[in-house]
């Protein structure tokens, strides 16, 4: 850093360069014009700057930053203007908060002297984002800009990761500053490791008859997947990976039970049902996994970096607040080992139903789509999804091989997440094939980001599982309301009856023609497949085609996601067919 007078905008990019920021996903606007002017100036001079990726809506930019962070483990950054730019970022911020994604969201703000005057495009960004962010800052004085930016990135990526919001007044971007205030990073004491508590957990795991490890997204965030696999072998204990933990252990590992919970695998849910000890590592006990009666008849142990998660929803018998690195290092250094031959024999029997078999049909089975893509990519592609039935099928039937290849909105369940997140994931690793699995409902919520795909020549392979329904809600309507469908049919128009009960395959003609998108977005190749007989060849052709490809896959409208633990029920009431 130099002490030459410069503007806040210049300082902004000096700090981002120093922090190693590669990409800014965003959209421009009046309150961030000084930043874009400085960016353009540096680009003309061929100076080092983060590459700016112009997304077509700020929400898309926010999800792209999430996708980048989830795929790389580095902090993702989004930039937007004040007012509607900031409010459009609210959903990605909340999404990143729910799933503990290391992100920094930078917004412009009206000049400091105009705050509180109801100025044009003024919103209280700090107040709005306080409950949905890890921390937030309002920069009114350029002298605070550097330390705030450095603190924001440190907070986003440390401890339990999460989104940090930095709201920068326009006059702070324009103001000149000579010697900047010295960076002020808050003193952070390392978490003291309680060896006695760790030993108690290891002893319980070694002496349990039917132990199960529940590995969460914290394993991915900590880069502890390899350590987890060694730990699983050391204690010969089956492991279930939560939705956000998928990829932490390879599918082929004999201890792997798959995903637990409402739409979890049969072996995962059976094992959790019958376990006498559940050890949660880096994951919370959310309502989709810790269903009714979850803790009955078993001991619960919990290791997490966030003390607020201990005893939050499930009573724990043994708890340890620690980094996973410290816990695994302690475990590997210990002399403890365990064998559970009878329990593992039962696990092996249950694993024959993972993933769950499904019957053939005259219509394309979505499960088959995922299995074929898994085979075509050797289970190594970065797999991104939207939210809905397609998301669950992808989680169930793709054979994950590594961490950070599964990118999906878990805690918030944000429809429209998939396409922009896939963009960010590709920028995180352009050499890695990125496959997007989406539904026709979720895909249309951020369809404008196809313009970002073609403008940047991003070779995404996009597969829309098209059932012309908001399928997950339709499934609940069929199971819980006698098949009465209320505004879940995407083919619905003003000629339809108020209560649509019949599922008519011919209604698809009233839907948008996804094949026509190749006429709207140059460089985009579109394909369609309706017949199971042509499915494998179409998917193979799509994966082999250069550039971005969109495949419209017509699936059975009535297909449900199974297994399913109905709301308010326990694992013993899991519906399998």
What are these regions (language model features)?
Residues 5, 57, 117-119, 188-202, ...:
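A general structural motif
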Residues 12, 17-19, 30, 34-39, ...:
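Active-site diphosphate/adenylate-binding microenvironment
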Residues 165-174, 347-352, 556-560, 567:
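A short, charged, Gly/Pro-tolerant segment at domain boundaries
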Residues 161-164, 337-350, 550:
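Flexible, glycine/charged-enriched surface loops at secondary-structure junctions
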Residues 133-135, 184, 348-362, 497-501:
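Short glycine/proline- and acidic residue-enriched helix-loop micro-motifs
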Residues 106, 114-121, 310-313, 319-321, ...:
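Thiamine diphosphate
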Residues 167, 384-386, 552:
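Short beta-strand segments
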């Amino acid at each position: 850093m130099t002490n030459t007078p410069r503007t806040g905008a210049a300082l902004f990019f000096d700090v981002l360069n120093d922090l190693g920021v590669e990409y800014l996903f965003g959209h421009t606007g009046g309150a961030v014009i000084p930043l874009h002017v400085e960016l353009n100036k540096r680009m003309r001079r061929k100076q080092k700057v983060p590459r700016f990726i112009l997304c077509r809506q700020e929400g898309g930019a926010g999800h792209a930053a999430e996708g980048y962070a989830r795929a790389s483990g580095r902090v993702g950054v989004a930039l937007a203007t004040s007012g509607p730019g900031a409010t459009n970022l609210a959903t990605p911020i909340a999404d990143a908060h729910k799933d503990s994604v290391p992100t920094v969201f930078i917004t412009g703000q009206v000049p400091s002297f105009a705050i509180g005057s109801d100025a044009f495009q003024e919103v209280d960004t700090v107040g709005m984002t306080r409950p949905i962010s890890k921390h937030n800052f309002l920069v009114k004085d350029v002298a605070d800009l550097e330390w705030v930016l450095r603190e924001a990135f440190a907070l986003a990526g440390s401890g339990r990761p999460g989104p940090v919001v930095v709201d920068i007044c326009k006059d702070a971007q324009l103001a000149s500053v000579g010697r900047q205030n010295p960076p002020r990073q808050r003193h952070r004491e390392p978490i003291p490791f309680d060896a006695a508590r760790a030993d108690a957990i290891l002893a319980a795991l070694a002496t349990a008859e039917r132990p199960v490890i529940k590995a969460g997204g914290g394993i991915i965030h900590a880069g502890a997947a390899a350590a987890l696999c060694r730990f699983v072998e050391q204690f010969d204990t089956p492991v279930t990976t939560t939705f956000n933990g998928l990829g932490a252990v390879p599918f082929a590992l004999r201890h792997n039970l798959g995903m637990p919970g409402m739409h979890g695998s049969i072996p995962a849910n059976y094992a959790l049902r019958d376990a006498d000890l559940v050890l949660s590592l880096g994951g919370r006990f959310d309502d989709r996994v810790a269903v009714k009666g979850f803790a009955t008849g078993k001991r619960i142990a919990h290791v997490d970096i966030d003390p607020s998660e201990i005893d939050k929803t499930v009573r724990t018998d043994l708890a340890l607040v620690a980094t996973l690195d410290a816990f695994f290092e302690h475990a590997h250094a210990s002399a403890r080992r365990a064998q559970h031959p009878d329990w593992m024999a039962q696990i092996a029997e249950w694993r024959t139903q993972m993933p769950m078999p499904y019957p053939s049909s005259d219509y394309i089975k979505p499960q088959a789509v995922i299995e074929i893509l898994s085979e075509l990519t050797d289970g190594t592609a970065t797999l991104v999804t939207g939210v809905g039935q397609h998301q669950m099928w992808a989680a169930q039937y793709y054979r994950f091989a590594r961490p950070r290849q599964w990118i999906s909105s878990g805690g918030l369940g944000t429809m429209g997440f998939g396409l922009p997140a896939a963009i960010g994931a590709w920028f995180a690793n352009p050499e890695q094939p990125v496959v997007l699995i989406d539904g026709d409902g979720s895909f249309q919520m951020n369809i404008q980001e196809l313009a970002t795909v073609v403008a940047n020549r991003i070779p995404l392979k996009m597969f829309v599982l098209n059932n012309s329904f908001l399928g997950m809600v339709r499934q609940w309507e069929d199971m819980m309301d006698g098949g009465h469908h209320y505004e879940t049919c995407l083919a619905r128009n003003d000629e339809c009856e108020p209560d649509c009960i019949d599922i008519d395959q011919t209604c698809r003609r009233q839907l948008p023609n996804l094949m026509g998108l190749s006429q709207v977005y140059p460089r985009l190749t579109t394909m369609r497949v309706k017949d199971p007989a042509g499915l494998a060849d179409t998917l193979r052709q799509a994966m082999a085609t250069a550039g971005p490809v969109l495949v419209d896959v017509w699936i059975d409208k009535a297909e449900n996601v199974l297994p399913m633990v109905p709301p308010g029920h326990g694992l013993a009431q899991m519906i399998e067919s």
